Amino acid sequence: MSALTGLEPASVFHYFEEICGIPHTSHHEKALSDYCVQFAKAHGLACRQDEMGNLLIKAPATPGYEKEPGLILQGHLDMVGDKTADCPLDLEKDAIHPVVDGGYVCAEGTTLGGDDGIAVAYALAVLDAKDIPHPALEVVLTVCEEVGLLGASAMDFFDLEGRMLVNIDSEEEGVLTAGCAGGRRVECHLPIARVPVTGTAVKADVIGLVGGHSGTEIHKGRANAIALLGRWLTLLTENGVDYAALALSGGAKENVIPKESSVTLVLPTGITEGVRAAAAQFAAQMKAEYGTADPEICLQLTEQGCGAFSALDADSTQRLRKALLLMPWGVQAMSMDVPGLVETSLNLGVAEMDEQEAILRFSIRSSVPSAKELLCCKVQTLTELLGGGVRFHGDYPAWTYARESALRDRCVAVYEAQYGEKPQIAAMHAGLECGILSGKIEGLDCISFGPNLLHVHTPNERADIASVARVWEYLKAILAYKA
């Protein structure tokens, strides 16, 4: 018996479990894309798969809906692959193991992939059903959404006929998203020089942070494990500790708030009283600043042996410290027009170092194009002042709120009929593919919604089973709506 047997809606959870069984992290969606192609063929549906793995599946209108405007259902095939430190799975090759925990579906030691596997499951369940009335449907499933919306940016929509698009990539039931931020990825490259250094290697691990989605959870005041390394190194400097940087790592993806990081230093005499004093000071500061948002935050020190090491020279070590300390991160500005909406932010999501350079990877977001450009300029200028350079990629536009929208009006009317109350109409700080699609398809009318998903992009991710069922009924009602 499968782990999700007995859950309703049965078809949705059947396909979601099928999706979990096929590895589909970003850049590794081919198997899932091929699965969907075979699904379309088995159901006699027209399907186009491009070189990247993006899909367009078409289904004709059911009887009585032939004259209704067509609808596009849209989601993405890829997921963020993150796991706990003790999880043995390779998410590029291994299946996710979903389990039921009370009223939720979660995964054993990994991200669940509800973002956006639930959209794919909804779409396949609709296409598979014989009893759901709907107009002509076009299902658009993209790849590499989580790494800069690359699939949507590259996909050619020459044969897309519909002009009303339902994106199922929002994570709060009752919220109809009608606008989102634009974004860009930034890589900061800092050249380093290594020299022979003799001493004791000491690894410092920042662990126990909550992490989270850098779009939807950036405003929650959570610590950034990579940025905290700059605080740690600065405390050592202030305490008169002599050290040379040996290794650096942190984070998993640019768009995930890093929950763990580490820096390995070569110290002349190991963990001295000065090091312990700095560690105690660090722990006290972190508890005072992040005790509510990250109650389990912790710094662990581990001696890793004595000897001669190829470590960073003094200049490179201090430039690395300054970069980790000074690089901006987190919320930079709140919207002056929409209460509670983050306008501009950046997330320092990944840190790594090889023999020649240290690399810091950011995800920058803003609903104001000029603010996005200014923040990119600041990061570039600071990097150049520290002797490095930057590379920009993955730029995508904001999705601007439309004052008039027939699709939004439909979704509001259906919501009021089903729930007995008005939905919240909102813009979101996370990037959605609606911005790219609206820019490429003239006259496209978009809306985004989805069931309750908690702690996305982390191993604590979970999908609310009852919410998945309610949103399924809501989606079916939208499909069955007649103007």
Summary of predicted features, one role per range:
Residues 2-104:
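Acidic/His- and Gly-rich active-site-bordering loop/insert found
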Residues 9-12, 336, 343-358, 363, ...:
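Zn-dependent metallopeptidase/amidohydrolase metal-coordination segment
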Residues 17-21, 264, 298-310, 347-351, ...:
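A short beta-alpha structural unit
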Residues 65-156, 162-163, 198-201, 314-317, ...:
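Active-site metal-coordination/substrate-binding segment of hydrolases
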Residues 134-225, 233, 237:
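Fold-level recognition of mixed alpha/beta catalytic cores in primary-metabolism enzymes, strongest
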Residues 158, 222-239, 267-272, 316-325, ...:
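His/Asp/Glu-rich mid-to-C-terminal helical/loop segments that flank catalytic regions of hydrolases
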Residues 222-227, 231-248, 401-444:
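Active-site-adjacent substrate-binding region
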Residues 254-330, 334:
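A conserved active-site cap/scaffold subdomain adjacent to cofactor or substrate pockets
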